[in-house]
């Protein structure tokens, strides 16, 4: 009888894991559970907020797609996990038994600053991005000060930088940039830290970009409150300061959703309810449970004065998904080989008229290679990659062999590595 793998989550991590499993093992029973009926291309959510993309341009409906690849799709919220009984219970009360479980839910958003959820905007979901788009129309009609940034505990800083620079470009195009003072406030110890201690010359590059575009910045502070007309932050000396604001966009922090917490403290990290995994992204206690994506508990790479987390970018998530799929299939086939993701990353930050290209191998130091470049070519590269990735989703193969070969030739990157000892922190070398 075929083994049954249940994947919770229909984002990059869930889709990539399901497709990798299907391509590695055609007779495997796979069920994907997601409360969203679509796959959304997260890196394009800033563009959706700016009105540069339509929702249908960057999303793919899952119900007609997944059955084509013999993957059952359940469009419901997963309510709870019983790791001892090997079951997932959905919102309707349906109990689904599994042999292996992959948790790729994505995070629960935590709007930790007072008034953040009510008075600010976000670009972390398609729905939030569309709401932000409406708020921007109000700003264009009645310009005033803009404040963008990240609250304490954030691990995903890139979109905030991208959004600030894209908004500068849009305001300039509309001829109203001179009416909009812009300030960037972040919990990072310095600009371009990104939660990973910087990537090459990222500090200098981002500081130069902001200086050239007249965007003021305040780093190493904790945003405490966001009110309709101002942002209140606290410095390291405990002093509070205010910055006037007509429009704000602040990245929230992340924690694991309730379904992860329901599995208990051996699956959910008590501190943040993220999935506890080892180097091979397997839960150390329940060996048939794996984590993929933002919901995995990767420890911070360094202690910062204001708490920051480690980002999990698209390329990192694809590598997690590939490693997990190989590990599940090898376990089914009684093959002792285990794999860990390399956790290297290509990040392209779109600035509107040009873009920044960042490559870190691996993301978690010490690194073997780092590349930071900037130019109009990177802007077009990101647009092309968006279309390419959505093509991969529609065609049931997130990891085509030619892509792996291209990365190996040009960047000397191998997405996964054979791991003789999985019992270590995720991201640590085997």
From Swiss-Prot:
The active site is at residues 156, 347. Coiled coil: none annotated. Its cofactor is FAD. This is Sulfide-quinone reductase. PANTHER family: APOPTOSIS-INDUCING FACTOR 1, SULFIDE-QUINONE REDUCTASE. It is found in: Membrane. GO terms for cellular component: membrane. Its EC number is 1.8.5.4. The gene is sqr. One of its GO terms (molecular function) is quinone binding. Keywords: Disulfide bond, FAD, Flavoprotein, Membrane, Nucleotide-binding, Oxidoreductase, Quinone. Its main location: membrane. A quinone binds at residue 346. GO terms for biological process: aerobic electron transport chain. Homotrimer. SUPFAM superfamilies: FAD/NAD(P)-binding domain (SSF51905). Binds 1 FAD per subunit. Disulfide bonds join 280-422, 419-430. InterPro entries: FAD/NAD-bd_sf, FAD/NAD-binding_dom, NADH-Q_oxidoreductase. It comes from Aquifex aeolicus (strain VF5). It catalyses: n a quinone + n hydrogen sulfide + n H(+) = polysulfur(n-2) + n a quinol.
